[in-house]
Regions:
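A short glycine-rich, Lys/Arg-flanked "PGG" loop and its adjoining helix->strand segment in the class I
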Residues: 172-184
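Class I (Rossmann-like) S-adenosyl-L-methionine-dependent methyltransferase catalytic domain
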Residues: 8-92, 99-146, 168, 173, ...
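A short SAM/SAH-binding and catalytic strip from SAM-dependent methyltransferases
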Residues: 156-169
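Short, intrinsically disordered terminal tails adjacent to the first/last structured region
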Residues: 1-2
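A short acidic, Gly/Pro-enriched loop at the edge of an enzyme's catalytic core
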Residues: 147-157
Length: 267
């Protein structure tokens, strides 16, 4: 009979082997979806290739891609409205970690008078955005600062499902950089994995003790870089990271599905 320790070791090996095979088969799956799927974009929007959709949502399903993007665009407006702000009143807005435009596709369509910008670490995604979202400006950023923007250029920066993946070193590097590109009084909207996510698993006591825990995802290993995996943190820990650079206005639990949101102001 297998002991508990031996069983856990065997299970890890089987899981690692399965995910290694899974990653090898992914390019074939992406090609088949692009070649034979009849998935289409909503009117007026463009459909990114399956490979890019998967890197953003871990799914090639076009309906889910657009559904999540529309829901995120709505959630941004709700969080802002709860603190008395209207998205249409902002002049220059940056999508930090825009990917292949899952959210920006909807926002630029709904708010054409806003000057939209997007930046991401993936050149292929930015290339696609430049070709398919001509109303916005796009840049490629490195894994660490700086961004290719002047000081005080934006009155709103949002980063949805970015700090859910960055390790603490990278988070602490990016927070002052996001402050730099914001105007005085500008807003930063971040999402993160809140207590309702990490409090149900083995990570709960460690997150409570340390404030933040970074986990390498078996599914994302080899697909995403080592510093961009899965991060759990307490609201107080993120508030502490922001406090030297921003005034936190609001913490909204489960504002973006399974992610919490923090809205902060550059003073």
């Amino acid at each position: 009979m297998l002991t508990h320790g031996v069983f856990k070791q065997w299970r890890r090996r089987v899981s690692a082997a399965f995910h290694a095979l899974y990653r090898k088969l992914l390019p074939i799956h992406w090609w088949l979806v692009d070649r034979f799927s009849k998935q289409v974009a909503p009117p007026g929007l463009a459909l990114p290739p399956a490979r890019l959709r998967f890197q953003v949502t871990q799914s090639t399903n076009a309906w889910l891609f657009f559904r999540f993007g529309r829901r995120t665009a709505q959630d941004i407006q709700i969080v802002l409205a709860e603190s008395g702000y209207s998205l249409g009143n902002f002049q220059n807005v940056l999508d930090f970690g825009c990917g292949c435009g899952r959210t920006l596709l909807w926002l630029q369509s709904g708010f054409p008078k806003v000057n939209w910008s997007g930046t991401d670490v993936h050149p292929e995604m930015i290339e696609w955005c430049r070709a398919n979202i001509p109303s916005a400006r796009f840049t490629i950023n490195a894994a660490l600062p700086p961004l290719e923007y002047p000081d005080s250029g934006f009155d709103l920066v949002y980063a949805v499902s970015v700090f859910t993946h960055l390790n603490e070193e990278y988070q602490r590097a990016w927070i002052p950089e996001l402050r730099r590109v914001l105007k005085p009084g500008g807003l930063l909207l971040l999402t993160f994995h809140g207590e309702h996510v990490w409090n149900v698993g083995d990570d709960a006591s460690e997150v409570e003790r340390q404030g933040i825990v970074f986990r390498t995802s078996t599914k994302l290993r080899g697909i995403m870089p080592h510093w961009y995996q899965t991060t759990f943190q307490t609201p107080s820990h993120l508030r502490g990271s922001l406090s030297a650079h921003f005034t936190v206005i609001r913490h909204s639990s489960k504002a973006f599905g399974d992610q919490d949101a923090i809205l902060a102001r550059r003073d």
